[in-house]
């Protein structure tokens, strides 16, 4: 199965490489703020929503690429190995501008087990076109797709408890100024406070050029609200992100939990019926002997 998935991944990647460049994704469920991780969405799980990105100096319309931008996206997982992301974005202040479309792919090579030292490892390709979100210089340097390899590992430390470390290497937007390849890294931690009635995920990352941070809140119904900031180390390039989406993951978790309860209840009922039948058989055996 993995061999066929790799073949499909390579074929689709080649198709993307020769298409028009567009922008990548931010604040996705399997990623951090703007960098990927060594994880993918599980089979049958999808996320659909929208996100907004704008610079601090977005009121200056002397250059269209500093304007606010809105995107609609869909991410879904296949076979617990492949994640596909589709994004449709446009310049909010200039509706007549060219619409950007992207298809991002990520293939899971190694799945991180619940216990053990094996990390999660994934490779992927992002089809980037930074006409809206970035400067002309950045867009010019990102005309080709960005390929990456990401590794993720969860650690359990005293007081800190569970947190995840993510590192990777990538081309194009991840690359350093004088290099074709760069590194990225990040930290993520999830909380489940009683007052929140949901999960809260905090993220901090370095994407090869800047430091980004984000906060995501996931309700029990699957609604996700995320806020983020990019380029914290460069006030002149500081930009903000906001996203709202919905995922079916919580519903599937409830269905899975309900199925487990049904299986357990069925097993208990069968055990009870067997115990009653055995008791009745033993009683029937004892009655003739007593006579």
What are these language model-derived features?
Residues 1-4:
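Positively charged n-region of N-terminal signal peptides that target proteins for export
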Residues 7-17:
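Bacterial N-terminal signal peptides
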Residues 22-143, 147, 154-157, 215:
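Transmembrane beta-barrel domains of Gram-negative outer membranes and organellar outer membranes
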Residues 38-39, 68-79, 100-114, 123, ...:
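Feature captures outer-membrane beta-barrel proteins of Gram-negative bacteria and organelles
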Residues 59, 95-97, 132-134, 176, ...:
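Outer-membrane beta-barrel proteins
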Residues 135-137, 173, 199-201:
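Extracellular loop and loop/strand-boundary signature of outer-membrane beta-barrel proteins
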Residues 224-226, 230-290:
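Flexible, glycine-rich linker and terminal segments associated
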